[in-house]
Amino acid sequence: LCIGDIVGRPGRRVVAEALKRLVQEHQIDCVIANAENAAGGSGLTPQIHEKLMKYGVNLVTLGDHTFRKREIIGTLEASETIARPANLSERAAGRGWRRRPGPGGSRSPGGRF
């Protein structure tokens, strides 16, 4: 499941209230969400990133507001569950791609996302 732009508290509330049910009902293996506007409508904080993971998001993508909240830089460097835009400089914090084990495990065909 790919979730478009999660915007502010209203967007986070919808994810918190509906995501786990959707994942169960539709047997979804992976949830990727764009969260570049999840913190007050612009940017992402480490705390909100952690909440999204608890709600059932597997991977967060970011966009042009990646660095709007400077406190996300440590999370970009440390977490395997967040990807910044790939077209930024290689010197920018974080990575523009992520490879994660999927439901079939890392050795099975298609077992990564």
What is each residue range found by the language model?
Residues 1-113:
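Acidic, metal/ion-coordinating pockets
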